[in-house]
Amino acid sequence: MSKSKRKRQQPQAVRAAPLPRPDSREIAVAHVSDKYSEYPSNGLTPVRLAEIFKEADAGDVLRQAELFEEMEEKDPHLFSQLQTRKNAVTGLDYEIIPFDSDDPRDKEIAEFVEAQLGGIEGFEDIMLDLLDAIGKGFAVSEIMWSYDEGHVVVGDIRSRHQKRFFWDSVDDSFKVRTQEHLARNELRTNKLTVHKYKARSGHPSRAGVLRVVAWMYLFKNYTLKDWVAFCEVFGMPLRLGKYQPGASEDDKRALMQALVAIGADAAGIFPDGTAIEFVNTEKTSSTDLYERLARYCDEQVSKAILGQTLTSDSGGGSYA
């Protein structure tokens, strides 16, 4: 029997699949409404704060993102602690190191990447925007791709507000709201830079530092409101005007105007026979109570953000 000869197959060169062209369109388009806020911190109560957190736990972080933004604006101590964390990163030097220092191709790639980063305007601002994740749990920037002499290059990197993103209630996937698809839109590959910071274990919507210190912010806010009201009542002596039993309405009106003028100008005139008395109040113990409570809240914020209170203020302190 003749045996059929098997043909020996020649090895074929395997061609790498072409890389997909980067999407040069702007996906997470900044909307005019992004700069506006519902200001959820106005009239904030424990009940409202819990409601905002429940919405974020369900995937909708819009009101939580707006609240966190206001917290940084309204609390100078909180702002300074977060800036300390961010400046510790932006102040560092960075270097692009080739994967293989002996491979000329790797050196060429490293030099290209370094030139790209150096050519991006405001690169430190971009890093600062991404470090916003420390407080809010995540931060997103969109890469605007372009072409230059046959190379795909980074034309710009634009920060996107956290309230444009959400977690899907069905599969918990991270999605972005766009002008075309306000309900759901998947994040595209190599298009968005997402920095997720985990101050603690759990879902990213609950992992930011500001989620931890929000209650201290609320209690301090109550304390400051009461302190301001206290200062308005007891911050200056009570001006008590006295008039004679037979004083006319014009005399009474003149006395009242004199009392008001003394409050603004520390001077006034009034008819002869009337008297103005200044009644001093001693409420130092209440003042100390407000100050101690506000300082306590600041110390807890410092511990949560920096891990200590020693370097937070010019005075003494202790490590947490």
Where are these regions (language model features)?
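Feature targets compositionally biased, intrinsically disordered low-complexity regions
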Residues: 42, 90, 314-316
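Activation/maturation switch segments at domain boundaries
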Residues: 2-4, 303
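Structured, contiguous alpha/beta core segments that scaffold functional sites
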Residues: 10-79, 84-88, 96-262
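Surface-exposed loop-to-helix/strand elements on domain peripheries
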Residues: 243-246, 269-320
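A short mid-domain helix/strand-loop element embedded in enzyme catalytic domains
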Residues: 230-234, 261-279
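Short, surface-exposed, polar/charged, turn-prone segments marking secondary-structure boundaries
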Residues: 169, 173, 267, 296-298
